[in-house]
Each structure stands twice: as structure tokens, then as C-alpha cells.
Amino acid sequence: MPGKMGKVVQVIGPVIDIKFDSDSLPDLYNAIVIKAGDYELVAEVEQHVGDDIVRTIAMSATEGLKRGMDAVDTGAPISVPVGEEVLGRLFNVLGKPIDKCGDIEVKQEYPIHRPAPSFKDQSVEPEMFETGIKVVDLLAPYQRGGKIGLFGGAGVGKTVLIQELINNIAKQHGGLSVFTGVGERSREGNDLYHEMRESGVIDKTALVFGQMNEPPGARMRVALTGLTMAEYFRDKGQDVLLFIDNIFRYTQAGSEVSALLGRTPSAVGYQPTLATEMGALQERITSTVNGSITSVQAVYVPADDLTDPAPATTFAHLDATTVLSRGIAELGIYPAVDPLESTSRILDPRIVGEEHYKVAADVKHVLEKYKQLQDIIAILGVDELGDEDKAVVARARRIQRFLSQPFTVGEQFTGLKGKYVPVKETVRGFKEILEGKYDELPESAFLFAGTIDDVIEKAKKLG
């Protein structure tokens, strides 16, 4: 049976008003298909305006759209394919393949608007998730089934860190990943896709993109498309990694849509529904008794201001934060993770163990002391410090460099072979540095090394 028929009566950019009979108005969030010859566009109902008009947001560019075109209510929200068939493929917001590898055989579809799991279905067992990245595993460990935020300004390495995590998860854990590109550069998405094909991790990953050049409707909904695909695997008992790059663009697209729909903006020009929209997405990203979704979300921080409403609203939902610092990047230390700003809820002796907790606390203490001494060093120089403070500075500089690490995904740029460091090795390395075992080794030996054994090898070569 064909759906309810309507006609396009107004087009203002991505906002389309469609007139239906007053007794057959489509429900909110229903998908509407506008067709004329070869032209086809999908829009989502956002508002009912008056008795017989619905206001919709287009999911693709509206060039070629005219008043008077026929529109059909599909009777359901946008639905996307789920299941094993989506692995290794690249999709748009509507779940259509965009990798030119042919259609997929759709066995099952889920609507992108779904309720979050109920309390009784949720799992609350805290467990550490090993990433193989030293600075993360030691100082701000990730929780299996947790939500992690990657905070940083433009160009400090958020996307590279995400790519390394995808690589490590696929190769070391054999886990499935869903990568959602929300409002980021198409070039980066293209590079990621080809790198994943070359490295062979693509078979364990589904990619969903709604990039910078797409209308706000697509950028606002593409995160839900990726999440829906991840939910299917979780409900089938698997551990999934959901990457969202960038969650700020989700908020930004929501802000554009809100303004287009005529809502009064709230603080800093953001949408009044900012917290509600963020909650609707984040509450669905959770672990159940069946399986888990661990999500890593890159968070662009406008003008490096962490108090901006977009990053501040995101903070409330996170279990761990990895803060990338421009100051550390300027020192040439990568990943440029700020060891003192990054936090984790599970850095707790009952979860990570007594030894790990103590080593992490001592590393932070030494780095904190070094930070306090930097003003004195800048004015008077290192020679004016007491012997104890000199030892702290020397050790802190070695720790700072040992927190760097060569990445597999950066091999073609750095010429250094990427290293995956198990958490036991990470703890042992930092413990021995704190004990003063390597005070005589040159600082440069600690930079871009994997384990502490690599440092010793490097020091021998440096002679």
C-alpha cells in the first residue's frame, strides 16, 4: 500500500515544508521520500506547522527541488541495514553504500531512532580495556563499555589517535569497530578508508560518513546511523568499538538545524535542546548483559575553551577523558596527551590493581612537581635548584619523553615502526624510571620508544 501523499510547498535551503491532508499528517521523525523522475531525496519530519503542513530537514543537497513535487510518507523513521553484511563497507546517513563496491544484501534493518536499553538490561561491571598506548593505559585507562572523550583543538592529533586505536583493536583484540565520521574532512575519511583497506582491518569495521560538505540534517543524524549498526552487534553478544569523529560537529549540526527551524538560541548561540540531543545519543551508547559498546569520541574544543557549552555538555557523559595539548605537541612529543589533564573513573586500585595505581600516582606527582619548578627554571636556570629538585626534573623529563610512542598508522610519516605496549610492560617501565634505574641514560633514548627494553637498546646505539 503506498504511503500518504503530499506536495512540496516551500523550500528554504535544507528546510522543506510539505503539505498533506490534515487527517493524514506523518509522525515526527518519519522519513519522507520526494521523487520526480530520476530525482530522489529523503527528508525527516521535525515539526508540524499548522493543520496540514510538516516541516522537514533534507538528508542530502536540495538542488533541483521544486515546489509542487510529490512527497510520500514512508510511515517509519529512516532505517539502515545491520548485520555482518555492513562490515568492510562504507555508508552514508541513509545506510546506502558509497564505496562503489555494489549493493549489499539487506537481511535486516533497524530504525535510527531507538530507545536506550532499560536499567535492568544494563551492565555495571567495571573492567579495564587495554589499548597498547602507554600514556592512556597508565594514566587515564579506558573502561570496557565506557565512553571516552578525546579533547583537543585543531591539528593536535585526535584523528591519528583514533586510527591507532582502530588498528590496535582489530589486530590485538580481533574486535569489531564502527567508525562514524560526523562533519569532518572528506579527505581524512578517504585516507582512513584506503589505509584500512591496505592494513586489512577494514573487514572488521563498518564506516559511516556524513562529512563537512553535507547538509546539516545528514551531519545531525549520521551519528545515530553508526550507533544503530553498533547496537546490533552489541545485542548479538559482541564487544564493539564505536568511534565518533567528531562529536562537536553533531552538536554544531544540531545548532544549524535548530536555527533553521526557528528555535530561539540559548548560551553562545547553541540550540536550546543541546543537553536533550546529547543525552538521546549518549544514553544509547552503553553496555548490556549481552555485549558492550565502548565509544571513543573526538571532541573538537572551540578556541581551546573547555567551558564552551558543547564540550562541557559532552563531559557530563564521559568515563574517561584524553586531553591533547598543543604545548606537548610543540615539544615534539606524540601522542600529545596531557598526562595531568587527562582523567579516568577507573584509575582505582580495586580495578587496575595496587601497583598500577601507585605507579600512575607517582608519575603524576613527579610531573606536577616539574610543572611547579618550570617558572623557577625559566627565571634562574636549572643550576640554581637543589640536588633533590634537580633529580625530580631529570626524572620528569625522562618520563615525559617515555610517554611518547611510535604509532603504526604514522609509520609512513615518521619512518619509525609502530609499537603496541602491553599494560604490564608500561607499568614496569615507569616503575623502574621512578626507582632511578635509568637516570644515567640520555633523555633522547626515551623519546619514541616502545617498552623500557627499547630505551636500553636505543641508549646503547647512541653510545
Swiss-Prot record:
Pfam families: ATP-synt_ab, ATP-synt_ab_N, ATP-synt_VA_C
Keywords assigned by UniProt, alphabetized: ATP synthesis, ATP-binding, Cell membrane, CF(1), Hydrogen ion transport, Ion transport, Membrane, Nucleotide-binding, Translocase, Transport
Keyword flag Lipid metabolism: no
TM regions (residue ranges): none
Binding site for ATP: 152-159
EC number from the UniProt entry: 7.1.2.2
Topological category with respect to the lipid bilayer: Peripheral membrane protein
Annotated InterPro entries: AAA+_ATPase, ATP-synt_VA_C, ATP_synth_F1_bsu, ATPase_a/bsu_AS, ATPase_alpha/beta_chains, ATPase_F1/V1/A1_a/bsu_N, ATPase_F1/V1/A1_a/bsu_N_sf, ATPase_F1/V1/A1_a/bsu_nucl-bd
Glycosyltransferase recorded as keyword: no
Catalytic activity from the UniProt record: ATP + H2O + 4 H(+)(in) = ADP + phosphate + 5 H(+)(out)
GO cellular component: plasma membrane; proton-transporting ATP synthase complex
Subcellular location: Cell membrane
Signal peptide: none
UniProt GO molecular function: ATP binding; ATP hydrolysis activity; proton-transporting ATP synthase activity, rotational mechanism
Recorded superkingdom: Bacteria
Assembly description: F-type ATPases have 2 components, CF(1) - the catalytic core - and CF(0) - the membrane proton channel. CF(1) has five subunits: alpha(3), beta(3), gamma(1), delta(1), epsilon(1). CF(0) has three main subunits: a(1), b(2) and c(9-12). The alpha and beta chains form an alternating ring which encloses part of the gamma chain. CF(1) is attached to CF(0) by a central stalk formed by the gamma and epsilon chains, while a peripheral stalk is formed by the delta and b chains.
Function: Produces ATP from ADP in the presence of a proton gradient across the membrane. The catalytic sites are hosted primarily by the beta subunits.
Stated family: Belongs to the ATPase alpha/beta chains family.
Protein name, entry field: ATP synthase subunit beta
Gene source species: Clostridium beijerinckii (strain ATCC 51743 / NCIMB 8052) (Clostridium acetobutylicum)
